[in-house]
Amino acid sequence: MKIFKQLFSAVFLPLSLFAQEPSEATSEETYSEPISTFSSTRVINGHSVETLSKGTYEFRIEHRFGDIAGVNGGVQQMFGFDNLSDMRIAMEYGITDQLMVGFGRSKGTGAPYRSLVDGFVKYKVIGQEPKKSPISITAVAGSSFTYMTAAPDEGLVTHFPKAVHRLNYFAQIHVAHHFGDRGALQVSPTLVHRNYVASTDVNDLFALGISGRIRLTSRFALVGEYYHCFNGSQFRQTGFTNSGALALEWFTFGHNFTINLTNSGGIGETQFIPYTSEQWQKGQFRLGFTVGRKFVIE
């Protein structure tokens, strides 16, 4: 926990100080209202600081293929296109301009879970505005529940002696700053709690996410994110790794389309943060895409 606080301070404090100086290339007229730091409520795998506006629905489809290379990839698997690591379908809704909720269903990777339903609540505490706030701050909390058939082996985390063991939780604070009209940076202190883990693992896992966005044109942007896990046991250090992703984002009014490259097979904070085991250097990374469609029902 001490290491987590120290690293958060090292990243967050310089960002806050720098954020107090507006870009010389940005006029006050440009930022006459709250600034949108990202174009979507997600960066790639993880949440962004953004929320849906009041009365807006968003239908989302997230898809992750199999390994491009390595022992499970290559030409025989059409570089991962023959396989499906995970897929999520979700509906999200903006209750107010600051508060939104979402619900989804994921296939699951099977490492360790399959057949998951999830939900979250997200609230924007403050938005970046000129002369008011140099940063945006958003809080999000959620949970996932697996309804897969319990494993008969009592030594597996999918044995589920009790129904509550099927639940996992996460909580995050997202802090972001928009630099001029091209760049954005976000830090995301994260806590993931799992009700049932291996005897050599830990229930509570702290992580720090760092995300960035560079706008290329009025329609395209490059985005990236990395989640570093802390307080891991020896079990976690040998069996799991950190999640990273890069993506090309294409956005239009009402639509957001992202083509991504990531080493994480699972979708959702309770999956990709604690259970990413694939390694970039072994070719265990995959293509994926996310499609979001916003609409209003009157």
Regions found by a protein language model. Give the residues of each.
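Transmembrane beta-barrel domains of Gram-negative outer membranes and organellar outer membranes
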Residues: 20-161, 166-171, 176-193, 214, ...
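Sec-dependent signal peptide recognition
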Residues: 2-10
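A mid-sequence, solvent-exposed acidic-amphipathic segment
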Residues: 186-231
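Generic secretory/membrane-interface signal
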Residues: 14-15, 115, 219
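Initiator methionine at the very start of the polypeptide chain
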Residues: 1, 19-20
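Intrinsically disordered, low-complexity segments enriched in polar/charged small residues
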Residues: 10-11, 182
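Hydrophobic h-region of N-terminal signal peptides that target proteins for export
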Residues: 11-19
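Structural motif marking the loop-to-transmembrane transition
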Residues: 3-4, 183, 217
